[in-house]
Amino acid sequence: MTLFRTLLVALAASVLAGCGYNEIQSKDEAVKGAWAEVISQYQRRADLIPNIVETVKGEADFERGTLTQVIEARAKATSIQATPELVNDPAAMARFQQAQGELSSALSRLMAVVENYPNLKANQGFQDLRTQLEGTENRITVARNRFIKATQDYNVLVRQFPVNLTAMVFGYKQKAQFTVENEAAVQKAPTVDFGTKK
């Protein structure tokens, strides 16, 4: 009887070792860590915006509409609670991504409009903020890429047999992923014309 129990325990241990639970835990933590980095970089960008807005406000005839768009987009982006659970809710993730995309677009328009204001372009404080913003945008891209990779690794794992059975038993589901904005437009190759066609 003791031999039977020993064999049963050994069999159970080997089955549990091969079920992938520990690997699911590891990949899940990697996704959470990568997500925390994404949030940290988005927060860094959000923290820079008030300084940029105040610097730009100093330019008396600056286009207020563009500035208002940036302020409103920042308010919308920071109103969405970016919790670790957000990656488990595709609809919430889509809302978060849309708000961050709108903020990126508003900032891009602001930087384009700034080109029309030589005094602002020459302002060292603004140039420093602009450099910090560009660096932050690069960090956001790196953090998003790491998150995409971690999420992809996790999602592949929880769909593979026999780990998918363990994932199902313990309630692990695929995680929401960042999507490409304007996916159809990105897939279509651009038409390049150097003025040679007549």
Regions found by a protein language model. Give the residues of each.
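A helix-centric hydrophobic-segment signal that preferentially recognizes long
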Residues: 2-198
